[in-house]
């Protein structure tokens, strides 16, 4: 029966498309988990940066200790930026602003049978993962080699921690 065969082929096509949609969803979840893991590492670095900045701001240490703390600060900031610039999923950068709502090239997951909004998930709009570089978060030029520089850095790092927490919250909300 030609009619039954047509219906059968149509349903088979739908099943195949829905299976691919499930795979697309799983890939999207993996991508978000990758970003979340990198953001967690960056968060740990920010906490350590704040700790050594607080140490450098005290009047009980000398210049030699501050120079040593500045070296660690610079190394950690470089690692922070390396994570932001190198974290990717299937060649797609994750923490450089590519997943921000304002990005021109968006990442949309096709989940269903047609192109309606109900069958597509726009990661950029849902996550709005803005760049997480030291420059974007406002501490790229900080120096803790002096106590006054450390005091300035403390304020900038507090703001950076707050901004990163907001970003992580959006990522976590999408994962739930």
Which stretches of residues belong to each language-model region?
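Primary detection of the long, small/polar-rich alpha-helical "axial" segments characteristic
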Residues: 1-176
């Amino acid at each position: 029966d030609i009619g039954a065969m047509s219906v059968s082929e149509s349903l088979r096509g739908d099943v195949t498309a829905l299976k691919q949609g499930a795979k697309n969803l799983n890939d999207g979840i993996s991508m978000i988990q990758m970003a979340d893991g990198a953001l967690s590492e960056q968060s740990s670095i920010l906490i350590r940066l704040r700790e050594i900045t607080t140490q450098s701001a005290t009047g009980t240490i000398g210049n030699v200790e501050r120079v040593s703390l500045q070296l660690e600060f610079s190394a950690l900031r470089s690692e922070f930026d390396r994570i932001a610039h190198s974290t990717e999923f299937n060649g797609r950068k994750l923490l450089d602003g590519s997943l921000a709502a304002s990005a021109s090239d968006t990442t949309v997951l096709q989940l269903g049978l047609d192109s309606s909004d109900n069958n597509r998930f726009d990661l950029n709009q849902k996550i709005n993962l803005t760049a997480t570089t030291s420059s974007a978060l406002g501490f790229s030029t900080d120096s803790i080699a002096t106590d006054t520089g450390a005091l300035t850095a403390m304020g900038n790092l507090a703001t950076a921690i707050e901004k990163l927490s907001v970003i992580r919250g959006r990522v976590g909300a999408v994962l739930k």
